[in-house]
Amino acid sequence: MNVTSNATAAGSFPLAFGLKTSFGFMHYAKAPAINLRPKESLLPEMSDGVLALVAPVVAYWALSGIFHVIDTFHLAEKYRIHPSEEVAKRNKASRMHVFLEVILQHIIQTIVGLIFMHFEPIYMTGFEENAMWKLRADLPRIIPDAAIYYGYMYGMSALKIFAGFLFVDTWQYFLHRLMHMNKTLYKWFHSVHHELYVPYAYGALFNNPVEGFLLDTLGTGIAMTLTHLTHREQIILFTFATMKTVDDHCGYALPLDPFQWLFPNNAVYHDIHHQQFGIKTNFAQPFFTFWDNLFQTNFKGFEEYQKKQRRVTIDKYKEFLQERELEKKEKLKNFKAMNAAENEVKKEK
């Protein structure tokens, strides 16, 4: 019996893609031997730990680049949340300033990631068959071998990553909300991000460096530690969270965008938070909205509409913004007329 070859076969990555595998090791009379060895990297030139730091940065600029091309060549004007001229008119930070601040944020998060990685264990393999054999012995026979195999090899990772999603959402909601409730924190830190009233993709991580460290870098670092993510699981969590954050700030409500279909916390939802009328609402980010719903901090302007439909459409949101602008102009017109009338009365006296 070649235990080493069995361990290697059962733990090999391609099996997840439907290649034939045998679960016979789960029915050995004795538990398969443990043959610990360092887990090979996905890329021969780079460790998985380094890849977990590089992949989110590459994903950030790749996805931002796609949206920038769409923006520059006007490829999806129908789905643009705000007219293109508003980007220059309403935003207080230049694109170059935003670009440099995001580069700084990436440098900081990479350095912090390297520090975290220094204290992480060396991830090993060669114990998986032994662990699954024990599970097979303890679990009812009605549970198929394949369920144990794929549940152990991939299901547990999915649960850990989902737990990471929940922690990141919790961390960011309460810290983000605190930044708005405390005037000092808002003035010194969070106000930088709100210099972009009309968000765009590569401005997603445009923050004061201190806020960027606390909100994004430290939050995901703690999530990684508490959920005991391996380097490969970190790659998924960090990269997915990064792409979701970019998509939330992209400035478009694209109908086939998977992020905007999978999550209620989408580009329109977050755009409301960047507007003056919604700045004290919609704190939840980047995945779910349950904290906003629980604490009633979600924007109520779409409450009736959301009862009828699962998500806010781009047309409805544009209509809403136009109505607010007309109301604002009408109020200003009435205010000026009232002042003029008061001045006339004073002159007559």
From Swiss-Prot:
What pathway, per the record?
A: Membrane lipid metabolism; sphingolipid biosynthesis
The protein's matches in InterPro entries, at most eight in alphabetical order, are given as: Fatty_acid_hydroxylase (IPR006694), Sterol_Desaturase_Related (IPR050307)
Inactivation phenotype: Phytosphingosine (PHS) absent from cell, with an increase in dihydrosphingosine (DHS). Leads to abnormal cellular complex sphingolipid levels. Simultaneous knockout of SVF1 leads to a growth defect.
Q: Where in the cell is it found?
A: Endoplasmic reticulum membrane
Keywords (alphabetical) are: Endoplasmic reticulum, Lipid biosynthesis, Lipid metabolism, Membrane, Oxidoreductase, Transmembrane, Transmembrane helix
**Signal peptide from the UniProt entry:** none
Q: Which spans are transmembrane here?
A: 9-29, 50-70, 99-119, 148-168, 209-229
Q: What is its main location?
A: endoplasmic reticulum
- Which GO terms fall under molecular function for this chain's record? iron ion binding; sphingolipid delta-4 desaturase activity
What GO terms in the biological process aspect are recorded for it? sphingolipid biosynthetic process; sphingolipid metabolic process
Q: What is its EC number?
A: 1.-.-.-
Question: What membrane topology is annotated for this entry?
Answer: Multi-pass membrane protein
Catalyses which reaction?
A: sphinganine + 2 Fe(II)-[cytochrome b5] + O2 + 2 H(+) = (4R)-hydroxysphinganine + 2 Fe(III)-[cytochrome b5] + H2O; an N-acylsphinganine + 2 Fe(II)-[cytochrome b5] + O2 + 2 H(+) = an N-acyl-(4R)-4-hydroxysphinganine + 2 Fe(III)-[cytochrome b5] + H2O; an N-acyleicosasphinganine + 2 Fe(II)-[cytochrome b5] + O2 + 2 H(+) = N-acyl-4-hydroxyeicosasphinganine + 2 Fe(III)-[cytochrome b5] + H2O
Cellular component annotations (GO), alphabetically ordered: endoplasmic reticulum membrane
Domain (Fatty acid hydroxylase): residue spans on this chain: 162-297
Report the sequence similarity comment from the record. Answer: Belongs to the sterol desaturase family.
What does the record's miscellaneous section state? Present with 54300 molecules/cell in log phase SD medium.
Function according to Swiss-Prot or TrEMBL: Catalyzes the conversion of sphinganine to phytosphingosine in sphingolipid biosynthesis. Involved in the response to syringomycin.
Q: What is this protein called?
A: Sphingolipid C4-hydroxylase SUR2
Q: Please name the source species.
A: Saccharomyces cerevisiae (strain ATCC 204508 / S288c) (Baker's yeast)
